[in-house]
């Protein structure tokens, strides 16, 4: 299975033992933050199971949603990405594969996306801070992911940044949008860039 392959070939090699899918199968619920009271699909408190309905229908294991982790293990994964697949002196993921996945795929269509990763807007450097994605400071080489439930990771090899922000935007319900309205995730990221630029 894909999940077993990723666990053995990536997560274990970087020492990430608290990252994976369906954590309710491995850990007591006291160690897992509840996600949301789902009043639409499952009609219950989601606790240790994937939030995304499509991934839930796939048994909680998918390539687009459902990965649970501690901040520490997620940072290890981001460091693997920042180092272009190298970790602890071993090339775990091909540098060429990561380069391809983190490159803009369709710039001619003004599409900023990589394969599985967000990228800054193509004209980010021309925009005001409030119009940028994710922030004005992000280099064209940077990449990351902004999750629906409130997670945010951003890697910027140009400035040696690996940024992990874990929160729960959808608790108690998905209608809680304060995190997005206040731009907390990207404001903190810009503060990281500002501290680097001020040196």
Question: What are the functions of these language-model segments?
Answer:
Residues 73, 145-199:
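Structured C-terminal helix/loop/strand segments within mature extracytoplasmic catalytic/sensor domains
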């Amino acid at each position: 299975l894909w999940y077993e392959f990723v666990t053995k070939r990536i997560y274990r090699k970087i020492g990430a033992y608290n990252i994976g899918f369906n954590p309710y199968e491995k850990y007591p619920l006291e160690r897992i933050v509840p996600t949301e009271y789902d009043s639409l699909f499952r009609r219950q408190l989601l606790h240790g199971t994937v939030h995304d309905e499509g991934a839930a229908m796939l048994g909680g294991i998918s390539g687009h949603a459902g990965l649970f982790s501690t901040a520490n293990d997620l940072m290890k994964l981001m460091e693997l990405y920042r180092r272009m697949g190298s970790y602890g002196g071993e090339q775990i993921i091909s540098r060429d594969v990561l380069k391809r996945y983190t490159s803009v795929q369709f710039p001619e269509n003004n599409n900023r996306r990589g394969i599985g990763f967000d990228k800054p807007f193509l004209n980010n450097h021309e925009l005001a801070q409030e119009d940028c994605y994710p922030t004005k400071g992000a280099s064209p080489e940077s990449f990351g992911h902004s999750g629906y439930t409130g997670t945010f990771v951003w890697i910027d090899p140009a400035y040696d940044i690996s940024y992990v922000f874990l929160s729960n935007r959808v608790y108690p319900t998905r209608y809680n949008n304060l995190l997005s309205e206040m731009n907390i995730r990207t404001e903190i990221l810009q503060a990281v860039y500002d501290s680097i630029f001020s040196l």
